[in-house]
């Protein structure tokens, strides 16, 4: 009886099924923790009148019983006579509830007795079938019961692990080729095509897992009922609170220094003073053992000098475009070239490979001739003879042409002799008359002024406009008459300044008045012709005030005139209106002084290079040079043909000038071009359409360039926005084997930069090596 009671305390078999309240558990599953939790949860439901079974349940689990339970393991075998005792004990625990149920199946034990390897009894318990009130869940047949063990450990065995009873879990059968084909045709529900690494079986997903994957794939929220756009509750900003969130007073530790920290700091300070705490030093290597002697085999090794006859190997040439893995299309051979290369003998081929396009570097295969090329390279290095070639030590200065000294090229202007002041605002244009006595200027104040060149005294002035500036002023060439042409706004004014002797003044007025009779003989234009934009304008007489001042005729062009240039005979002059809104048919106009006639030679815009900028007549041929923004075109007026196109290569041409001795015995056609991109270009038209020389000496745009007229002095000058003028010596010869000689002579500085503008125009004295400049600072200067 004693043994049986002891066994009943250790292991109890459930003798009935608990339907509603699981108050009794088997001895293997019930422990102190389960008991405390069960009693605490059902404390309110228990009545004060507890039955005997509950008292017996508490008595069975005493301290002594716990000690005995620790001594007996689930795999230990009880002695004979314990089983009846255990059955009676379990019956006593059930109490009167067991008497109410008469089912014989409930009285069966939940274990069976088998013999182990030693011939002793072993208890094998049945699998627990939990109900709704149990902590256990249903056993999943597909669950991994072998633990967290990689299946690769069992690759050499027919099983994949062991279950809780120590039996082998055999490897699941794999589908053959026919099963795989059927699965691919009829995909089973939950099929993924993957294998579960924990069980070795096909991985199947539940409907919830599939729905979760679908939501993740569709970028939806996986969690049900989650609202990512809930209204923001600004707890601390939406309502103004009067009382503070915490009215606790500030602790003293926040504003009183800590005494504890002060003590620790003083200890550290004292240790530093006593030398017990030293500053940090980087760790050094441990001192080597002096007894160990290390020998350096290469201590006395000296570099071996090269052999006296040593010649370094020549370097391989760098690879070209044809050796690239992605060469340009023009390097790729076509079918005809590839066939010809393949049919050619390998020794006669120009190159040992054909270029190929692989698209990317990772697609480039191995080079089949790599070993062969390296072998031939080695053969060349030790079989081919080498020769030393001495390098030519050439002084770079010796390659430059020897230019004459500027002292040998005098005279040329070097100093400022006279300053002309009187204009309000910028002085845009300047011109010296053919006699070299008077100087005409025009500026932003709309006045045209004539000065005495040597003294700087103003002789004559006229107000041509209150709003527009005088953009260009030019004297008529020739000494038989004195006529001054000025472009102001969209009008051209022809004036005879009353500064000459009466006979010359009378001849000048008669020259202009002769055209009025010729103009009167022409039929007047109709109303339809007047409405056309390309209708030539009619010359008109000036107002009485302007006529009294010396203005004789006005030409209304309807567009702003920027440049004006006379023909060498003095009967024609050409004007250019470079505005972007100016029609192409009226941008360039040629005027005849003796007939008071204006003509538009171009009906269409010049192709390429933008709108026209300036134009000049050839000094000895019936050729008109017209420059737009990028090119200069030469037109033969007699044959009405395009003769030549000059390409300076500049971005925006500002001005150009023709050499006065062009097409004579002294030389061919030569022109100089100034551009807004700070370049001065010399063109020899018989040599090339491209520039012969390009000079870049200015820091800002070049506004004007000019040759010395007459060809007496081989000089030319340019004016720039950097406030300086540069004088050059440019000589041309009749020898076709020699080129023009260009020598920089002098940089003239005197104008002030105003509004990012410097020197706007420059002109030469007809007989002397003097030049006159007009600046944005409102002054003109004579340089001698």
Curated annotation (Swiss-Prot):
What Gene Ontology molecular-function terms does this entry list? large ribosomal subunit rRNA binding; ribonucleoprotein complex binding
User: What SUPFAM superfamilies does UniProt report for this protein, alphabetically?
Assistant: WD40 repeat-like
Annotated stretches, region: Disordered:
1-138, 303-353
- From the UniProt record, list the WD repeat ranges: 422-461, 465-505, 607-645, 648-693, 697-738, 754-784
The family note in this entry says: Belongs to the WD repeat BOP1/ERB1 family.
What spans are recorded as compositionally biased (Acidic residues)?
47-81, 97-108, 128-138
Checking InterPro entries in the record gives: BOP1/Erb1, BOP1_N_dom, WD40/YVTN_repeat-like_dom_sf, WD40_repeat_CS, WD40_repeat_dom_sf, WD40_rpt
Keyword Endoplasmic reticulum tagged: no
Assembly and interaction partners: Component of the NOP7 complex, composed of erb1, nop7 and ytm1. The complex is held together by erb1, which interacts with nop7 via its N-terminal domain and with ytm1 via a high-affinity interaction between the seven-bladed beta-propeller domains of the 2 proteins. The NOP7 complex associates with the 66S pre-ribosome.
Q: Where is the composition biased (Basic and acidic residues)?
A: 112-125, 332-342
Chain's role: Component of the NOP7 complex, which is required for maturation of the 25S and 5.8S ribosomal RNAs and formation of the 60S ribosome.
Q: What is its main location?
A: nucleus
**Segment forming the signal sequence:** none
Subcellular location, in the record's words?
Answer: Nucleus, Nucleolus; Nucleus, Nucleoplasm
Q: Which organism is it from?
A: Aspergillus terreus (strain NIH 2624 / FGSC A1156)
- The primary gene name is erb1
Q: Does the keyword Disulfide bond apply?
A: no
Q: State the SMART domains in the record.
A: BOP1NT, WD40
- Kindly provide the name given to this protein in its UniProt entry: Ribosome biogenesis protein erb1
User: Ranges of Pro residues compositional bias?
Assistant: 314-331
Q: Name one GO cellular component term.
A: nucleoplasm
Biological process according to GO: maturation of 5.8S rRNA from tricistronic rRNA transcript (SSU-rRNA, 5.8S rRNA, LSU-rRNA); maturation of LSU-rRNA from tricistronic rRNA transcript (SSU-rRNA, 5.8S rRNA, LSU-rRNA)
